[in-house]
Amino acid sequence: MAAARALWKANQTLLDPARLVFIDETGTSTNMARLRGRSKRGQPLISKVPHGHWKITTFVAGLRCDAITAPFVIDKPMNGQIFRTYLEQCLVPTLQPGDIVVMDNLSSHKSEQVRQIIETAGAQLLYLPPYSPDFNPIEQAFAKLKAHLRAAAERSIPALWDRIGAILEAFPADQCRNFFKHAGYA
């Protein structure tokens, strides 16, 4: 594992950031609340936190050096069939010949069908080394997305999905470049 990470790090500078598309998914839910808060010294922090029933959804997207691309939200866990559908219907229409699609080693990402879908679009597929979220700049974008979702505290699926769309529009190109730079690609 350490050797694979070292090899990836050594070859990062050979990858053209303008051609890279990082793909990943993250969970979002209707019970998201701020993790921290402030109150006056000696006063307890009082905040509403949902208990009981909530709904979990999966958000998947791609990150380019200048934008988030091909966002997709579903109300169930990711599996191989759903991921292939995402690739065919959302990601592939955004790909250009010569793009390099990079993803982690999730089992739903590693089928031969996934490779065929990507390569048929004229793009190349690369997998990150195992246990290497630090090489995936979309993880930083997801951290920002989740911080905004916790602050918004949406409690219904339609409101949650609308909020995700609004937050995605607030990701400027320079911030996407900073995510790439922080992960070592610029």
Task: Cite the ranges covered by each PLM segment.
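Short functional hotspots at interaction and active-site rims
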Residues: 1-186
